[in-house]
């Protein structure tokens, strides 16, 4: 169970996230100045360059990575970071894709909890 940061928009990590602090520094993003360290980060879809995976990996190294990521549709740009983090640092960052209907239910939530064995996410408002 972890705090949720939710945005109804895409997100790029390269140039948007400070990998040393986990703070979102793009003043055009809905999560501007929010710190994702140890939180569940929900954004609609990834955008941007292949550097996203490297930023996530650096966040793991500095202890500033999100606890998990929720998307409508992930892609290799995001997935490479958690995959390499598992291999090099033995750190799990779950990446979950959910429906638009379920994604909308996350708006306003304070925390979420994953249950992989039941393929379920509990939402706490």
Regions found by a protein language model. Give the residues of each.
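Phosphate/diphosphate-binding glycine-rich loops and adjacent basic-rich segments that engage nucleotide
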Residues: 117-125
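Feature captures the catalytic cores and cofactor-binding loops of soluble hydro-lyases/lyases
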Residues: 4-116
């Amino acid at each position: 169970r972890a705090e949720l940061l939710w945005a109804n928009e895409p997100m790029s990590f390269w140039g948007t996230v400070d990998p040393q602090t986990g703070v979102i520094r793009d003043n055009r993003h809905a999560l501007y100045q929010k710190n994702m360290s140890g939180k569940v980060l929900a954004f609609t879809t990834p955008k941007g360059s292949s550097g996203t995976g490297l930023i996530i990996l650096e966040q793991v190294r500095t202890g500033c990575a999100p606890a998990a990521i929720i998307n409508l549709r992930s892609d290799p740009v995001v997935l490479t970071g958690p995959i390499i983090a598992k291999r090099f640092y033995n750190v799990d960052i779950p990446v979950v894709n959910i429906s638009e209907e379920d994604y909308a239910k996350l708006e306003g939530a304070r925390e979420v909890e994953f249950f992989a064995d039941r393929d379920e996410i509990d939402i706490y408002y």
